[in-house]
A protein has these predicted regions:
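Metal-cofactor-dependent catalytic cores
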Residues: 1-247
Length: 247
């Protein structure tokens, strides 16, 4: 029997995730997932691709606040879901969308830890960022994700990969929202629809893996090749395990 093993949220794109027992789903995907994002001085989005130390910042939901914890720095809090803000336009993968500015203090906190000028911005409900229409026929939207509201991995797929690696890697490297157990290795490759309780999900496409999979989540440093290089001459080398899904 295939079971939902864990649920992970990423309140701010690129930071460490939060494991939760349950979550609500809104128009953007999992509630509170990637509604915050860091941008540089040109309002271009930032991720672990440029700043691998981002993964060392651990968010913590405390009521209506998002508490940020980083090694060697005092914790900092920002509103989890701001009710208002100064509008600005940000760029993510070449797309322009509306965002709200955070306080200057918040920008200083991130800049001090990451060693690069940056500041957090929030995606309000009024902002619209559509998923790729080639894979979504229902005008689905998403937050500051790489492209789709949900990412799914099977535990068996990671176990299969780790048998081929000299040093096993952790699930955290692949940053899934939904982790399933009880499936065969790479069974998610064949899934078209997924039912979790009363919610039905459409499997959109494999998710191409990027440099983020080479970031050691415990050290915040790049460490070697993409783990899926163990599948040479195989589409899985680029689309390892993880599935982009809609609801």
């Amino acid at each position: 029997m295939i079971l939902l093993d864990s649920i992970n949220l990423y309140p701010c794109k690129g930071l460490a995730g939060i494991s939760v027992n349950e979550t609500n789903i809104d128009d953007f995907g999992p509630e509170n997932d990637r509604r915050w994002m860091l941008v540089d001085e040109n309002n271009e989005f930032l991720t672990q691709r440029q700043l691998p130390k981002m993964v060392l910042i651990r968010p913590e939901i405390r009521g209506e606040m998002l508490r940020l914890n980083a090694p060697g720095q005092a914790p900092h809090e920002i509103p989890l879901m701001p009710r208002s803000g100064t509008a600005t336009e940000v760029s993510i993968f070449g797309e322009q969308c509306e965002a709200w500015e955070a306080s200057a203090d918040s920008g200083n906190w991130f800049t001090q830890f990451l060693g690069s000028p940056c500041r957090p911005v929030f995606m309000p409900d009024s902002s619209r960022r559509d998923v790729d229409p080639d894979f979504a026929k229902n005008s689905a939207r998403t937050s500051f994700t790489d492209g789709f509201p949900f990412l799914l991995i099977g535990i068996a797929s990671l176990e299969d990969l780790n048998q081929k690696l000299e040093e096993p890697v952790k699930m955290r490297r692949f940053r899934p929202n939904l982790v399933i157990s009880g499936s065969e290795a790479f069974e998610e490759d064949r899934m078209k629809r997924i039912q979790i309780g009363e919610i039905s999900f459409q499997v959109a496409k494999p998710c191409g893996r990027c440099r983020v999979t080479t970031v050691d989540p415990d050290r915040g440093e790049f460490s070697g090749k993409d783990p899926s290089w163990r599948f040479p001459q195989n589409p899985r080398k680029l689309n390892f395990m993880i599935r982009s899904i809609l609801f």
